[in-house]
Amino acid sequence: MAWQQLHLQCEKDNVDLAEALLLEAGALSIALDDAGDQPLFEPLPGESPLWDEVILTGLFDATIETGTRDVIEQLSHEIAAQVQASRSWVSAVDDKDWEREWMSNYKPIECANDLWIVPNWLTPPNPEATNIIMDPGLAFGTGYHATTRLCLDWLTEQDLTDKVVIDYGCGSGILGIAALLLGARHVYAVDIDPQAVLATNQNAARNSVDNRLQAFLPEDFTAFWQQQNIAPVAVMVANILAKPLIGLAPYFVTLMAPKSRIVLAGLIESQTEQVTEAYQPYFALDPKHAFTAQEDQHWQRLSGTFTG
């Protein structure tokens, strides 16, 4: 299979917007690199410092219409203008080169409260911790991205004991698997990408929770839900993008039990108000706010309690 890479060089303040635009355009993964020679000191757990000038590289499937060279060239000009990129370019990469580069970029990380994400080809640094063994493949969700970490942090704060959870936009399955390892009874994982469904099932097996997780494409999940007459769930996790989050609000509430909890991520600061407006009619205020908004750089996390 052939791939196209879109490279953008921009200031760190524009990185979150660039990531959001690349994902919205269909990027399968995004890597960040230093555009100069600026050193970064070892970060604290959960921190993700950035260089002043950053090169973002988005990976696109060149075998589909939205990933052809001409399309990606045009996309590079459009996104570069929006993020004030100092330069942009497109390159091709084959499977073997990408696999080598991809594996070398990952190491175990502690995300929250003794919860570790460990690539499946490495050994957990702390065998006594809660270790999620991951091979994300080409599905989104490695634990390195701010939106994933925001959701993982939220999950560790919830009482998930014997709860049924929906992980909508599951990517690699990392959030659903984390929920199971933190005490959930069962997880329904949903994603529009067949590769994500495959990766989720494989990662669930790696963590010995495949008997408690079912992964679906959206249309298959809807049919399954209706045919099996599934009871409303106690927890909903949706780490996708602002536009689909807004459109899915009325659908999500049909899947949720009264007083169930929801967390939403994948939106940047400028999108928070619109997403809040879409969900606030259905969700009660948290202790001090309608939603808890937690900022990791410019990415936002919203959470609330269903009143239906």
UniProtKB/Swiss-Prot annotation:
SUPFAM superfamilies according to UniProt: S-adenosyl-L-methionine-dependent methyltransferases
EC number assigned by the record: 2.1.1.-
Alphabetized UniProt keyword annotations: Cytoplasm, Methyltransferase, S-adenosyl-L-methionine, Transferase
Top-level taxon of origin: Bacteria
GO annotation, cellular component aspect: cytoplasm
Main subcellular location of this protein, as a coarse class: cytoplasm
Species lineage: Bacteria, Pseudomonadati, Pseudomonadota, Gammaproteobacteria, Moraxellales
InterPro entries named among the record's database cross-references: Ribosomal_L11_MeTrfase_PrmA, Ribosomal_PrmA_MeTrfase, SAM-dependent_MTases_sf
Protein's UniProt name: Ribosomal protein L11 methyltransferase
Family: Belongs to the methyltransferase superfamily. PrmA family.
MF-aspect GO terms: protein-lysine N-methyltransferase activity
Gene name in the database record: prmA
Native source organism of the sequence: Psychrobacter cryohalolentis (strain ATCC BAA-1226 / DSM 17306 / VKM B-2378 / K5)
Residues that coordinate or bind S-adenosyl-L-methionine: T148, G169, D191, N239
